[in-house]
Swiss-Prot record:
Its main location: Golgi. Disulfide bonds: none annotated. This is Vacuolar protein sorting-associated protein 54. Residues 516-558 are annotated as: Disordered.
Amino acid sequence: MASSHSSSPVPQGSSSDVFFKKEVDPTKHVRPVQSLPDVCPKEPTVTDQHRWTVYHSKVNLPAALNDPTLAKRESDFFTKTWGLGFVDTEVIPSLYLPQISKEHFIAYQQEISQREKIHERCKNICPPKDTFDRTLLHIHDKSRTDLEQVPKIFMKPDFALDDSLTFNSVLPWSHFNTAGGKGNRDAASSKLLQEKLSHYLDIVEVNIAHQISLRSEAFFHAMTSQHELQDYLKKTSQAVKMLRDKIAQIDKVMCEGSLQILRLALTRNNCVKVSNKLKLMATVHQTQPTVQVLLSTSEFVGALDLIATTQEVLQQELQGVHSFRHLGSQLCELEKLIDKMMIAEFSTYSHSDLNRPLEGECQVLEEERLVSLVFGLLEQRKLNFLEIYGEETIITAKNIIKECVINKVAQVEEIDTDAVVKLADQMRMLNFPQWIDLLKDIFSKFTIFLQRVKATLNVIHSVVLSVLDKNQRTRELEEVSQQRSAGKDNSLDTEVAYLTHEGLFISDAFSEAEPASAAVDTTSQRNTSPHSEPCSSDSVSEPECTTDSSSSKEQTPASATLGGVDIIVSEDMRLTDLELGKLASNIQELLCNASDVCHDRAVKFLMSRAKDGFLEKLNSTEFIALSRLMETYIVDTEQICGRKSTSLLGALQSQANKFVNRFHEERRTKLSLLLDNERWKQADVPAEFQDLVDSIADGKIALPDKKPAATEDRKPADVLVVEGHQYAVVGTVLLLIRIILEYCQCVDNIPSVTTDMLTRLTDLLKYFNSRSCQLVLGAGALQVVGLKTITTKNLALSSRCLQLIVHYIPVIRAHFEARLPRKQWSLLRHFDHITKDYHDHIGEISSKLIAIMDSLFDKLLSRCEVEAPAPSPCFRNICKQMTKMHEAIFDLLPKEQTQMLILRINASYKFHLKKQLSHLNVINDGGPQSGFVTADVAFYTGNLQALKGLKDLDLNMAEIWEQKR
């Protein structure tokens, strides 16, 4: 049996490759069977035979889609139902997979070729020990056949007789059953089973022995090298022990002390952190009582800062602490309560600030309280506090007027407050002096009120600007810190961090073990006070005491000093620069709105007094006083708020327009009455009018405040002397000059009516010109006044009056030009038109005088005969009329104008005389007729030149004769 199993089952290397492969495959049956997971259950189970499982699948979807035998008619299997998108497409090669060629293996071949050569050389030096031949192969086949006789159950890796199934399979119970008459047969079966098992054992032992014999040399080599291996292991063990001893000594000398220092430093830092945590928890625990104390003293900013800091600590340092799980929500509710308290406190402050007595200096009421409130409101983004202040200003403005009216009415004894219940009706019972005093009081109170509002808003504006400045400086510091941190990151990247056995970086350990104070050395501090506390609650600047959130903030809160109050601008101000800028502009707008409110209330006060026509009945002096008072108040409010309010200015302009209309209508009516009663005779000039004209010449265009006492003793003059020129005038013109000065003075007193006054004055001058023309040239005075005739003296006096007005028109123009804005200078052209109209009127009067004499000459000379005696009666009559004309105009008109009129009259005389001589055929031939004419002309010339101012007048009488041809 042993010989039958001595053949080797391993094929030899002399066989061909094909034979080798075929012979190697059966050896796989000799290997131990590997246990694989059961896919299907081995034991019979009850299953649903109709239930479909994955094991029923015969063809999968990829196989169906990639079927090479797909018929052409089935190419539209998917497209006919699902669309043209479901068609066979060619798969594009991946762009990420390179094309592999032989060049890619060149480096590998060069690297492996050397190893291959060494391998081949070793094969040649050490040939295979086992050689295969046909005999061994036969023996191997025989041994394999013997092994196949052994049941497979003995070859299982999980073979165990303690398993009942395995035991029953190996030793069936039927061989041990001794019942009945079958005992002998069962004994034989048991013996046969024992022999069979022994046979199986022999086969296995033979195969094992054969395998050992095949590897005998390896066993002997292993046994031989065992002693050498033991020596190597012993030496290695000794070397390892020595190395471990050295490492232990090195660790004890060089590392253990340092690591112990690190452990102690870490332990110390951890203890410090725990201590600081406990102190922080104790501080946080006192937050609510501290907030209550701060609120009791109205320290809203401090309370809000404390709440914000506590919230930050709860979220960062004390996150997850169970005892503080409800503190965050409680602080949020407390913060909402503080918001309501601040709004109520600011409303109370506004009421008390604006309703205090309007007397004394305009100081801010409790500036510290105001600054604290504003900072708190800004920190909480409660920006509607300005609306509260604006509403309070409206209410206060109403109360100011009401209080002033009540006080004034109480001072007037004539007003029965019991009979007149309404306050507005009581106010209307005041006369102008009382009412103007009341208005002065109201304007004074409004001015003080606005100054107080401005002072308060300036404090609020300063707070807003300080917060805005803090935001800008914080951004600058953040930019600088970012640049520095970027530089630090670059330097930290180059540092080497060593990892200890506890997983801590040494650099981190040393950084955490830095001294509590920068001025004290670490070693000396540890030696001098090893048990001292590294940090206290007060020394928050030390690194151990700083929390993560506080240490990360490099910027310190900005401080501001407002009105002597030091305020720390919190880092938690959540307002943007845009919001702060808008808030600052709203503060200025609020001041302007307060001014507008005061103006609106003043307008309502004026309108309530004007209901009964009180303002329209004011005289010039009273209205000017009212206008100046209102203009002064408008200027004062403009200086306070920097913007001119228009409501009161509009009301003043409206009343001024009404005043101008009434003023003009009164003067126009007065002038019309004067002209209608004017008899156009020369009037005496009182001394006050002469003084008035003199003051105009001195550049003072205004009426005197009082009538000088010296003028009452002076007698009236015959003429008005203006800059050395004498003007004979009628009484209407004197009063017209005074009226013109009233217009000019009204412009000075009320500059806003300059334009209206200019148009009204030009209208008045036009009216005087047209009306005087109607009365004198148009002979309207005959019916209006009852004159019998319009004499040459009337005409000359009218002309001289017009000349006086023309003299003053440039003065009036210059006065208005100095008070009109440049863009309205075009209105001054009306004075040019008026001047032209006046000159035309004066020319028409001169023409009228000439026409009178012309008709007289035509009448007298047409009946004149050249005969004795000389001078003839006709010429005597002409000389008489010329003398009357001269007497009528010489004292009224200036000398130059008189001479010009005489020359023009003389020309008319020569024209008619020449015409008559031509009619009579009288020529200058030296005959008797020419002698008579020459005597008459000489008489006329002598008589005319004998008059005042006409002595040197060149009459040129030779023109009366026809020129000889």
